[in-house]
Amino acid sequence: MYKELALALGLGTVVALVFLKKRKSVLKAHDGWWGVGACHQGPEDDSIRPFKVETTSEEIEDLHRRLDQTRSFPSLEDSQFNYGFNSKYLEKVVSYWRNDFNWRKQVDKLNKYPHFKTKIEGIDIHYVHVKPKSLAEGTRAVPLMMVHGWPGSFYEFYGIIPLLTEPSSPDDITFEIICPSIPGYGFSEAPHKKGFDGVCAAHIFNKLMKRLGFNQYYVQGGDWGSLITTNMAQLEPNAVKGLHINFAPPGKAGLLMMLSILFGRRFPKLFGFTEHDVKRLFPTMEKLVVDAIRETGYMHIQSTKPDTAGRGLNDSPVGLAAYILEKFSTWTDPEFKNLEDGGLERKFSLDDLLTNVMIYWTSKSIISSMRFYKENFSKGLNQPHAKLPVYVPSGVASFPNELMHSPKSWVTQKYHKLKTYTPMARGGHFAAMEEPQLLAEDVQSFVKIVEKRKKK
């Protein structure tokens, strides 16, 4: 047993050394055209236009009419959220949405920060741009792009923005925040051509930062945002000074990873596993296979026929809310599925949850947001970006209730300049919205380390 293990580790070390000696590669991307019809000839319109979220009485009346006409269907007895969104609690959500939720007030809240649009590669890109109100003499704001995922939106960052642009400690870094909407999400125009994946989004977001005058900047993301920001770093390693993510799913399974799966439970220290790593990874079949199948049904639908399922969600606000909010329950804490209310109001307010739903509803973006899965997965799992390491300074905030867990030893196989890996005290998938203070502190710690090392 021990001889076999030693031999396997020796082979793994040789493979790793050969891999690391390869010349550093940069991900390649080409300009695309995602607008309607043929590519526009001539220079691209690079104007930046102020934008405001708006609503009308007709829009609100249409919503109320649809809420009034919803058809309820009873959940099974004693099923809680194990079959999906519990119908009894959904009735409470719909009642609050219809009678108490003030969309006009939430629109004003959305507009508390400046919004803009600019056209890149044929489509309008929406983003929120927040500059610090004041800066101490001799200091500068550090540009940071924060990218959301599905089924979130730029609104996820409204709680963390003031913590980063107006830090309470004079020792903290003051940030200038840019929060774009992924094309096809919220108020960014949806691509009109097939093939728009994470690399394409990353290429556009790097262009956006350059258009805003930033030659170097930091990026942060969770869910799809982690893929997009990772791709941004792979595309422009000289522009992206640092990458911070709070979602680091396991990468391509190499020999060392396979060995750690086979022997890590018995020899955790040999593979750098902590007690939490062992708890999240083993037994392997249950944690890495069964749990994944149980929670990824939506992914199979959206990766194959997004337009079919999306049509019903685009027509029914109640269906849309159930589909989105069920993820805010289970992905925040898997144990919440055993609660009648899904634990939703333990971590979030209904106003915040419904505001995120309303961004999808009013922008009619649920179908185009779901297509992003098909565009990424239909190209296969062996894409260049999946095989290419990240060479820019990176930081990972590992939240205990995240959907998928990657031990530090796995993360370093992808992110070769990992500066921080923080096991967080609490929190799940929607970290910026659920635990803005914890995430802000980790971003601060990471950027301070990178900035300090840059000065040496």
Could you tell me what each predicted segment is?
Residues 2-4, 17-24, 163-174, 212-268, ...:
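Conserved hydrolase catalytic core segment
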Residues 135-187, 447:
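Conserved HGGG/HGGXW glycine-rich cap/lid loop of the alpha/beta-hydrolase fold
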Residues 13-18, 40-52, 56-59, 239-360:
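Alpha/beta-hydrolase
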Residues 1-35:
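N-terminal membrane-anchoring alpha-helices
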Residues 58-133, 352, 364, 368-382:
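Non-catalytic accessory segments flanking enzyme active sites
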Residues 193-211:
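Alpha/beta-hydrolase active-site loop
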Residues 103-105, 182-196, 230, 254:
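Glycine-rich "HGGG/HGxG" loop immediately N-terminal to the catalytic nucleophile
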Residues 301-456:
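C-terminal subdomain of alpha/beta-hydrolase-fold enzymes, centered on the catalytic histidine
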